């Protein structure tokens, strides 16, 4: 298997520039805490349980750092806006994995990393994008990245919504097993307890606050995963 980044002075410089850009994705998406680094740690721990080869785990960690380069390249204001997306915005946003794949290639990442970036929104039931892959058509590393990305997003705050508790996030993940997520990957996530990156950043709930909502579970999940 090829190196994570093809080696030349020019390509090493491109790699460093794009890893810095990947770190800037957290700022662009306005997560309260380091998002991509957190995903990489969670994904790597799950990959370890599946006995992925060291090189495959390294590719997965790199893809986790770079997975939302497409969103940064698109520079869409709606990503930072409160509320649900319009149908047109949702269709536009679904372009970001392909754009991210192209950006990873420009950074001289190897093909494994490029494809993980492309496929990090594929769903177990085939309803994901951009290629509508399903079940084992999706590489295991991409299925792991999907779960790790979702859990990290649910348990971190953004300006327009709070973080979920660990318990609530796990409930959401369980409910979407065999729909969006590989059930086997979900089971491994649920077995992890001592990893610092699994900690939720949810703040204590004000007992006097109105916590009622008219959103059903799907709309709530969609809001958190924008």
Question: Where in this protein do the model-derived segments appear?
Answer:
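Histidine- and acidic-residue-rich, metal-dependent catalytic cores
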Residues: 2-226
């Amino acid at each position: 298997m090829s190196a994570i980044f093809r080696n030349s002075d020019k390509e090493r410089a491109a790699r460093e520039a794009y890893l810095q850009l990947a770190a800037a994705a957290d700022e662009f998406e306005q997560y309260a805490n380091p998002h991509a680094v957190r995903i990489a740690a969670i994904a790597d721990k799950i990959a370890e349980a599946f006995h992925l080869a060291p090189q495959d785990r390294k590719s997965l960690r790199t893809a986790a750092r770079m997975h939302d380069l497409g969103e940064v390249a698109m520079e869409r204001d709606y990503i930072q806006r409160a509320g649900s997306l319009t149908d047109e915005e949702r269709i536009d946003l679904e372009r970001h994995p392909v754009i991210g794949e192209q950006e990873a290639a420009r950074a001289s990442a190897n093909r494994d990393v490029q494809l993980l970036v492309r496929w990090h929104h594929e769903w177990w039931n085939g309803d994901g994008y951009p290629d509508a892959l399903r079940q084992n058509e999706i590489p295991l590393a991409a299925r792991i990245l999907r779960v790790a990305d979702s859990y990290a997003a649910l348990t971190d705050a953004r300006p327009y919504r709070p973080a979920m508790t660990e318990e609530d996030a796990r409930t959401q993940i369980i409910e979407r097993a065999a729909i969006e997520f590989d059930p086997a990957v979900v089971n491994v996530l649920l077995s992890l307890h001592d990893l610092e990156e699994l900690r939720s950043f949810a703040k204590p709930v004000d007992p006097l606050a109105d916590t009622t909502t008219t959103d059903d579970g799907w709309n709530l999940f969609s809001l958190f995963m924008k």
